[in-house]
Structure formats: structure tokens, C-alpha cells
């Protein structure tokens, strides 16, 4: 099943793209950060269309849980700020919901 790797690709592409804008507007980085940021956001949008889902809304709902976990990984790895126990607990709840949506037996 390629759903999880595809969602992870989408998540890190979205987070990276949004972080480029954050770096420009909040961290004072060069506007040259915007070009790779926009390319990363385009990759994110493309990746989400590759998920095997019958409805966009279901794909986006499942993606939400993966995105939350990925955001905390980004915060820890890139911004060097480890998540606290409440971040981890909240992400666990969201990930559980996403996994139910992804792996639910449909049409059976």
C-alpha cells in the first residue's frame, strides 16, 4: 500500500513549502526562498492526487492526521524544538483517526 508514503511525501512537501514562506516573512530570509517553496507546494498538491481514494474529502481527512504527526517531526528535526507530551498525545489521537479512515474496509 502506497497511501502512507504518499501522504508523507505530501506532508513534507506542504510543510517545506509553507516553511519557505514562514522563513521569508517571519525569519527575515530572502524572497528567493519563495520559488522552491512554491515548487514544494505544487509537489504537495500533486502527491495528494496520487492517493487511492474515491473522494477528495476522504483523502484530505486521512491526510490531516499524517500532516499533524509530520509537522511535529519537522518541528523537532528542522526547528530543533522537541514536541512535548501534549503534542505527542494529540498527534496520536489524530493519527489513530487517520489510520481508521485509510484502512477501513470500504464496500464490504
Swiss-Prot record:
It is a multi-pass membrane protein. The chain crosses the membrane at residues 2-22, 27-47, 59-79, 85-105. Signal peptide: none annotated. The keyword Cell wall biogenesis/degradation does not apply. Its main location: membrane. Keywords: Cell inner membrane, Cell membrane, Membrane, Transmembrane, Transmembrane helix. The keyword Transmembrane applies. GO terms for cellular component: plasma membrane. Pfam families: UPF0060. InterPro entries: UPF0060. It comes from the Bacteria. It is found in: Cell inner membrane. Belongs to the UPF0060 family. NCBIfam families: PRK02237.1. This is UPF0060 membrane protein amb1014. It comes from Paramagnetospirillum magneticum (strain ATCC 700264 / AMB-1).
Amino acid at each position: 500500500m502506497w497511501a502512507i508514503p504518499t501522504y508523507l511525501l505530501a506532508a513534507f512537501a506542504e510543510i517545506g513549502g509553507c516553511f519557505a514562506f514562514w522563513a521569508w516573512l517571519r525569519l527575515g530570509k530572502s524572497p528567493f526562498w519563495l520559488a522552491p517553496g512554491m515548487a514544494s507546494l505544487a509537489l504537495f498538491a500533486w502527491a495528494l492526487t496520487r492517493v487511492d481514494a474515491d473522494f477528495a474529502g476522504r483523502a484530505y481527512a486521512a491526510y490531516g492526521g499524517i500532516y499533524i504527526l509530520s509537522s511535529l517531526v519537522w518541528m523537532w528535526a528542522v526547528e530543533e524544538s522537541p514536541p512535548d507530551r501534549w503534542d505527542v498525545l494529540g498527534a496520536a489521537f489524530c493519527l489513530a483517526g487517520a489510520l481508521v479512515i485509510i484502512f477501513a474496509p470500504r464496500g464490504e
